[in-house]
Swiss-Prot record:
GO terms for cellular component: cytoplasm. Mg(2+) binds at residues 173, 193. CDD domains: Obg. The gene is obg. It comes from the Bacteria. It comes from Prochlorococcus marinus (strain MIT 9515). This is GTPase Obg. Transmembrane segments: none annotated. PANTHER family: DEVELOPMENTALLY REGULATED GTP-BINDING PROTEIN-RELATED (PTHR11702), MITOCHONDRIAL RIBOSOME-ASSOCIATED GTPASE 2 (PTHR11702:SF31). Its cofactor is Mg(2+). Its EC number is 3.6.5.-.
Amino acid sequence: MQFIDQANIILKAGKGGNGIVSFRREKFVPAGGPSGGNGGKGGSIILVADNNLQTLLDFKFNREIFAKDGFKGGPNKRSGASGENTILKVPCGTEVRDVHTGIILGDLTIDKQSLTIAHGGRGGHGNAYYLSNQNRAPESFTEGQEGEIWEVQLELKLLAEVGIIGLPNAGKSTLISVLSSARPKIANYPFTTLIPNLGVVRKADGNGCLFADIPGLISGAAEGVGLGHDFLRHIQRTKILIHVIDSIAENPIHDFEIIEKELKQYGNGLLEKERIIVLNKKELIDENYLKIIIKKLENLSKKKVLVISSALREGLPSLLSEVWNRI
């Protein structure tokens, strides 16, 4: 399934039904009064969060969405039926923003949470509504109101508790695959991962914690280089970031600094999040050189640096213990 995490859509609620002009016509009632009923309310458009959805793909080719109009009133003061509401299911973690003002209209983070965006128009009044002592046979009626029109941006921000970040080819996908049941595409070249991969990691008590492998960030990601903004938004809701560094890269220290710079420039509190620094691929590097890198990273980050091998599954219990202690 294609992963779509942003969509702009136009929502048009239903028009209210018109009121009607009608008079009571019954045998033995030669001068029946007004009996025109009111129109029904137009349908509204309601967004509902659904835990079973992981993408906004449904909105890729369905950019204009309508609700049903209300029905006109009937004789004998019968009100018209309301128009049917349109229910749009979106993934949990979907933020809804007004395209024109940038104002956030809602944030759907809980399964079955709902948000009415476009409200249906009110039904018009039939002539029975206008009966008065001064006018015993009114012939006035009103049309139903137009429904609201909204142009909104849907933006999916994953609800993972732990985000795994780092430059391309640092070993993030291998890490999430050995920690969880996730099966991302893995290969020895940059940008193997083009969409976030999610995996549930089980604690000792059996409870699950959602991890997200965020596609490799690059220098300039905060300004949108590559797919930077698309990737960075998905770590905004995480509680902890695991920063994976390739220990056999040409310059692991510089790689660390690149990601730190991008987190700072993107803002939104990313740099203030709890972070665990991890050196990966320990099995491929000289032990003495590894110690030098660890010391430099710890001096630079002011944090303890963990050393692991995702491929050999070494150091993972210590990493998970650190994660559980911080959540």
